Amino acid sequence: MVNSDYSLYLVTDRSLLQGRSLLEEVRKAVKGGVSMVQLREKEAGSREFYELAQTLQTELRELGVPLLINDRLDIALAVDADGLHLGQDDLPLPVARSLLGKEKIIGLSINKREEAREGEKMGADYLGVSPVFSTPTKADAPPATGLEFLASLRQEIKIPLVAIGGINKENLKMIKETGADGAAVISALMGASDIEGEARKLRQIWERN
C-alpha cells in the first residue's frame, strides 16, 4: 500500500479559493506539511473532475503525497489515484474494494459508533470521524460528535481515525490528545491567504503535541 500518513490531511474546496489555482494552492499546502490530499468536487462535471484529478495525481505522485478521490470510484480508477473516500450513502465499501484492489486506500465517513464498527469490519483503511466540531463547509452535516466520542472510539477501533469538521489552529491540539491518527482540514487551509504558512503552523502544532 502507498504511504499512509494521515496526520495533516487536506480536503479540497475550490469555492474557498477566490479564483486562485487549485494546483498551486495544493502544492503550497504540501510544502507546508500536508501529508495527504482528498479531491472533493461536488459541483464539477465528470470531465472537469477527471482533468483536475489527473493534474493533481501527477503532481502529488512526484511529491510522494497520496491523492484520494471523494466519492467517485470511476475517477479514482481513471487516474489511478491512491485511494477513495466514501460517505455512508456512497457505493458500498466492499464493492469499491473489489474494483480498486487491496493496495489502494479506502476511507469511510462515520458519525456513529455502529458505523465505525461496521467500517472496520468491512475493511476500511481509515475512518473519517465527522464532524467533530460544527463546520461551515457542509450545510447538511449531522450534529458534531465532539472530542469525547473521538477519544472513546480510539479505545475500541484499531484502524486509523481521522477527525474532520471545524478543525483549526485553536483546536488541533485537542484532536491530537484524543489519540486520533490525523486531522482533515478544509476551510482552515483552503480559505487561508497564505496556505503554506497555515499548513506549517498546523504541522508544528501536530508535531509538538
Curated annotation (Swiss-Prot):
It comes from Syntrophomonas wolfei subsp. wolfei (strain DSM 2245B / Goettingen). Signal peptide: none annotated. It comes from the Bacteria. Pfam families: TMP-TENI. Coiled coil: none annotated. The keyword Transferase applies. 2-[(2R,5Z)-2-carboxy-4-methylthiazol-5(2H)-ylidene]ethyl phosphate binds at T135, P136, T137, G166, I186, S187. Belongs to the thiamine-phosphate synthase family. 4-amino-2-methyl-5-(diphosphooxymethyl)pyrimidine binds at Q38, L39, R40, E41, K42, N70, S109, K138. This is Thiamine-phosphate synthase. NCBIfam families: thiE (TIGR00693).
